[in-house]
Amino acid sequence: MFLTNISCLIIPILLAVAFLTLVERKILGYMQLRKGPNIVGPYGLLQPIADAIKLFTKEPLRPLTSSKLLFTIAPTLALSLALTLWIPLPMPHPLANLNLGMLFILAMSSLAVYSILWSGWASNSKYALIGALRAVAQTISYEVTLAIILLHSNLFSGSYSLSSLITTQEHIWLIIPSWPLTMMWFISTLAETNRAPFDLTEGESELVSGFNVEYAAGPFALFFLAEYANIMMMNALTTTIFLGPTYNPTFPELYSTNFMLKTTMLTISFLWIRASYPRFRYDQLMHLLWKNFLPLTLALCMWHTSLLISLTSIPPQT
């Protein structure tokens, strides 16, 4: 039964990820006044299936000087962690309703750093290693603000469980009282998932595609799937924390529809940003976090904490 539950979670995610690649190529195409994929199947709808067949039937080449074990483990670990992150998300019922769901997501997203680092180091290529070090520095840095903003949402909901956020947002979305945090969270999720304009790990001109430069065929496809699964997961988490869909026990399907629509809109905005903005310089990326986001999030954290303490002695207005 448990295996059925897991497969019912994993298969739709992988299908959504496959078609997200098509949506991205279509959006980028239309924004550049061209069609995008339109040959394979009607309107190019079978393009993801053709891509999957092509990638998984090619021979997975490996550099002779690479570390065989780590080179193989890294993409598998990346996809496994990307799928594990979906476990505590309420849609409206999570696969496992964890009391510390927020901390679980934070810990799992931190572990994703290892797959990037191992892939860069095991490739035994200086381009891959520099790309991996960039990615690790960027991911670890932006996790700081993500953790502080998660602490804010914990202050609002009074629990580390993600399911409690549904109850918290019955009357008002958290985006309204905490819109500066939401903006910083959204930009931090862009950086955390290595998306444009923060995709410095893939600097084609200087790093030749970054940490996955030596990967081909199946292992490359696993990294690709992990990246897009992380994008969708981060947007699903943003929806849960700041745009809480209304849960009606008599119509639980409405929650799922609402949740999926909001997640889709946020994901399309990710793609829109990629098509619109140029890449940041590395020092600008780090200055944005350490000199702007970190002081702001800490100040807002102190403000929200002190606000709760200062209002505790005030009687309720009945």
From Swiss-Prot:
Top-level taxonomic group: Eukaryota
Chain ranges passing through the membrane: 2-22, 36-56, 69-89, 100-120, 130-152, 171-191, 217-237, 254-273, 294-314
PROSITE patterns, A to Z: COMPLEX1_ND1_1 (PS00667), COMPLEX1_ND1_2 (PS00668)
Keywords (A to Z) from UniProt: Electron transport, Membrane, Mitochondrion, Mitochondrion inner membrane, NAD, Respiratory chain, Translocase, Transmembrane, Transmembrane helix, Transport, Ubiquinone
Bilayer topology: Multi-pass membrane protein
Uppermost EC category: translocase
Pfam families per record: NADHdh
GO terms assigned for molecular function: NADH dehydrogenase (ubiquinone) activity
Chemical reaction(s) catalysed: a ubiquinone + NADH + 5 H(+)(in) = a ubiquinol + NAD(+) + 4 H(+)(out)
InterPro entries in the record: NADH_UbQ_OxRdtase_su1/FPO, NADH_UbQ_OxRdtase_su1_CS
GO terms classed as biological process: aerobic respiration
GO cellular component: mitochondrial inner membrane
EC code(s) of this entry: 7.1.1.2
Similarity-based family: Belongs to the complex I subunit 1 family.
Listed name of the protein: NADH-ubiquinone oxidoreductase chain 1
Record organism: Cyclopes didactylus
